[in-house]
Amino acid sequence: MTKEKIRVKLRGFDVELVDQSSKAIVQAVQKAGAKVCGPIPLPTRINKFTVLRSPHVNKKSREQFEMRTHKRLIDIIEPSAEVMNALLALELSAGVDVEIKQ
């Protein structure tokens, strides 16, 4: 017997926003009466960029920037229509990308 589940992936640059959004999703789903696994922290992706400080001279003088992408995974086991309505009605911050798969 296979169990139906919904997988929610959260992605963002600010770790606090990602954690707040994951807590809000877990609370909404538990309030609707479904079983939740997570939030599971996935590896943080770090993109590093090195650029010249000056456009003309001083080749040895460089500046480094990094961009961190934080990810969380939440599994909702045996969701109902009420759980889906709770997920769709949830207001999350603009800095978090939410991907829902079945």
Swiss-Prot record:
Annotated Gene3D superfamilies: Ribosomal protein S10 domain
Cited InterPro entries: Ribosomal_uS10 (IPR001848), Ribosomal_uS10_CS (IPR018268), Ribosomal_uS10_dom (IPR027486), Ribosomal_uS10_dom_sf (IPR036838)
Protein name: Small ribosomal subunit protein uS10
Record's keyword terms, sorted: Ribonucleoprotein, Ribosomal protein
Classification via Pfam families: Ribosomal_S10
Gene: rpsJ
Function (record text): Involved in the binding of tRNA to the ribosomes.
GO biological process: translation
Subunit details: Part of the 30S ribosomal subunit.
Coiled-coil ranges from the UniProt annotation: none
Family under the similarity heading: Belongs to the universal ribosomal protein uS10 family.
One cellular component (GO) term of this entry: ribosome
Keyword hit for NADP: no
